[in-house]
Amino acid sequence: MASQDGTTELLSQSVNSTCIPGSTYHVDRGRASSASTPPTSPPLSEVDYTPLLESTQEPRHEYTQLAHSLVKAMADYVGHLQEENLPMPSLEPAAQVHGGLKVQGGVAARDTVVKLAQKIVAMTMDPEMKLFISSLQFHFCSSLKVAIDLRVHELDECFRASSRQADALALARYREPHEADTLGFGLAFNTTANFWEVLARDTEGKRSQRFNRAMRAVNINALEVIPRIYPFNRIGGNGLLVDVGGGLGQVARAIMATNQGSRLQRCIVQDVCAADDVLEEVLESNRKLGVELQRHDFFDKQPVTGASIYFFRHIFHDWPDRACVKILKQIVQAMGRDSRLLICDQVVDDEPSIPATLYDIDMWTLFGGKERNRSEWEALFRAADERLYIKKVWTTTEAPTTILEVCLW
């Protein structure tokens, strides 16, 4: 009896993959045959497994016995699914979860399959390692450290915003986000202002402190890796790097310090708060490395024209496509013939990993932003200016950080 996906036939072949004493079935390379009858496979529920399980000349090892018991249990479970007209188990997203089995025997058969499979896994990888993994000790320890380092217990904005994102999605009628949309963040905190505006209005500074601590944790490894991803020491033009939205110059200082004495001679760090209450020690560090701060909103006209590099790190994933196009248009107008646009952001796979997907949801919930794959980046550049194209995507084995090198035709 063949099932929708051939599972029944496959199990039948597994059971009859050898000569079974007392049965009429002989299998040669998966083909059942008999001297007097045409090849056929019996329904799983009608297969007699007793000869198979007892047909050994010496005691069967427990490990092998488990395998045969698992096949028998799976066949029993399949039989119950067929009796209740339920589909075969599958990993497909739309697959039905078999929590609605009506016959108790089917539930018991399913539980037996799970228990046998778990025991086989434990014996295959050794019981000690299985206990370590199943108890999640490594997960708890590593997660606790991350939670403490990031002070997750203080991330009020993220958790409350996530709880309302489904409502925000319904309000937007399930389309791509726009700048003016009400997000989960807005619903959670009853505000029409975006995250950055709320952060700027934080008179007590608690939100700003939480955000800055989180960013410091994110930057721990990135500051060392970024200067090595792209050959900043070989840039052409006037040797000027403009770090747009670069805060107080953390990344810029790392890039300049790594490329002392190269063609990279000067750096301007632009941010809306670049001149607010900057510590003297920060200003001194910047001056020594040729870094200067400039107040600038990247939605406004770019005041520095013809720079060798316009650098954006973790900016575009904070904004929806329409806002990103506005930012890019300002840069295109300022770029010279030899200018390069460097975007340090994720380029996710077409089938993104779970962490990348969760990060994408975070950006969407808080900012209306998104993580993008290569085709989405290309579409974004075309929407800003048909002349923009990706020359190269720079990657490293040290970290998942990526730099897109974008030029004008």
Curated annotation (Swiss-Prot):
A Pfam family this chain is assigned to: Methyltransf_2
Pathway: Mycotoxin biosynthesis
GO molecular function: O-methyltransferase activity
Active site: 317
Null mutant phenotype: Leads to the loss of pyrichalasin H production, but accumulates the tyrosine and phenylalanine analogs of pyrichalasin H, called magnachalasin H and cytochalasin H.
UniProtKB keywords: Methyltransferase, S-adenosyl-L-methionine, Transferase
Domain of life where this protein originates: Eukaryota
Sequence intervals crossing the membrane: none
Enzyme Commission number, as recorded: 2.1.1.-
Enzyme class: transferase
Residues where S-adenosyl-L-methionine binds: 271
Polar residues bias (residue ranges): 1-21
A Gene Ontology biological process term: secondary metabolite biosynthetic process
This protein's record includes keyword S-adenosyl-L-methionine: yes
Region (Disordered): 1-46
Primary role: O-methyltransferase; part of the gene cluster that mediates the biosynthesis of the mycotoxin pyrichalasin H, a tyrosine-derived cytochalasan that inhibits the growth of rice seedlings, but also inhibits lymphocyte capping and actin polymerization and alters cell morphology. Pyrichalasin H is indicated as the responsible agent for the genus-specific pathogenicity of M.grisea toward crabgrass. The first step in the pathway is catalyzed by the O-methyltransferase pyiA which methylates free tyrosine to generate the precursor O-methyltyrosine.
Family assignment from sequence similarity: Belongs to the class I-like SAM-binding methyltransferase superfamily. Cation-independent O-methyltransferase family.
Protein name: O-methyltransferase pyiA
Lineage summary: Eukaryota, Fungi, Dikarya, Ascomycota, Pezizomycotina
